[in-house]
Structures are given as C-alpha cells and as structure tokens.
A protein has these predicted regions:
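Metal-ion/cofactor- or nucleotide/acyl-coenzyme-handling active-site neighborhoods
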Residues: 1-214
Length: 214
C-alpha cells in the first residue's frame, strides 16, 4: 500500500477538508498554514530568508530575515518536530532540511530547447515544490496512492491565479504516474467549463485590445 498525502494551504474555502481526512493521511503544511491545520507530517518554507526585503521592511510588522513573515513565524517553525523543507538549512529551525532541488531537477526537469544541457523544473509556488517532491519520492519507490488537496485554490482574480497552471501540471504528472488525485468539494483546481460544450463562446477578456495583447 502506498501513502496518502494531503497538501494543505490557507484558502479557507477548502482548508477545512484536511481535518475531515483520517489519521493515516500525511499532512504536508506550508508557510503559515498552521493557522488552519491541526496536525502536520512535513512542513515547507521554500522562500529565501530575505523574501521581499524592501516591501516587508516598509510594513513595519514584518522583518527581513523571517521569510517575509512576522518574527513569530520562525519561532513557530523552530518548535516543529517534523521535517521542515527549505532551500537551505536554517540554524534557528532544528528540524529544517534542505529541499532536494538538484536531485529532483535531474530526475524530473524538462529540457529547454535553448539550453539542452540544463534541465529545469517548472515551479511557480510552494505547492508545486511539494507536489514535485511527492512525485520524486513516488518514482523512487516510496509510493503514493492518493494525493489530496485542501486549502489550495489559486482562484482567478487573485495574485495566485498565475500559479494555478503549474500546480495542475504537477497533479497531472502525478496522475499519469498512477496516483489518484482527490480534490476538496467545490475546489477551483482542475475545474472549468468544458470547451464547446458548457458554453457557446471561448473565454474572452473584456479588457482585451490589440494594444495590450503584446
């Protein structure tokens, strides 16, 4: 039997779904999703320490060496007794481990035609990093039967909407490798009208003009 994993984000529309799952489902949290989830098996903080340094210093309530979050973020992560995946080990977080970026790139990276000797991963969000690691482990024998998604929406009209195609790309790669994808009820992921069936006209941006098409 393979593992069952649930990726948890902070979107309140579907974050509740994680708590409805049985205890044998691994809970992979990210960033500040500890505000919506009660247990975790792994954690992910992929941002650089000085993430958006200029912006966070302007806000005053954030600090530049805390991954663009409030100072208590590092304090909370420092108390976790589960692996905390990061770009680099943080001495303030005893459970921090380095995300195996090079190994995953070598195994799963795409080959850009302009740089055929440099495999590159398609990753536009922390959730994508999490899915890539799950696929990497699955293909290396630590198999995954089910991948659940909770609190990860990336809805159109939000700053995260540009990250949605990448998450759906990795879900597709997992599905193609035999993993069952289980979505929370009413999620925005993998959901859209059927082209030429559910509507008569293609989606059209009302603000589209020849000038802004470039």
């Amino acid at each position: 039997m393979g593992r069952k994993i649930c990726l948890v984000g902070q979107a309140t529309k579907t974050a509740w779904y994680a708590e409805s799952l049985p205890s044998d489902v691994e809970m992979w949290g990210q960033n500040e999703s500890y505000t919506v989830q009660k247990r975790g098996t792994r954690w992910f903080q992929i941002h650089p320490r000085a993430w958006r340094k200029a912006e966070v210093l302007e806000l005053g309530e954030f600090e530049a060496d805390f991954y663009g979050r409030r100072p208590d973020h590092v304090e909370i992560l420092s108390k976790l007794e589960i692996p905390v995946y990061m770009k680099e080990v943080d001495e303030r977080i005893p459970a921090s481990v380095k995300y195996p970026f090079d190994e995953i790139t070598a195994m799963l990276g795409e080959i850009p035609p302009e740089t055929p000797d440099e495999p590159r991963l398609y990753l536009t969000s922390t959730s994508a990093y999490m899915l890539a690691l799950a696929l990497y482990e699955h293909l290396n024998g630590d198999t995954v039967d089910e991948m659940h998604m909770a609190g990860i929406e990336m809805a159109v009209g939000t700053e995260y909407s540009l990250q949605k195609p990448c998450v759906e790309y990795w879900l597709g790669r997992l599905a193609g490798s035999g993993v069952t994808i289980v979505r929370a009820p009413m999620t925005e992921l993998l959901r859209a009208p059927l082209y030429a069936i559910d509507h008569e006209m293609p989606f059209v941006d009302k603000n589209f003009t020849a000038e802004n098409a470039m």
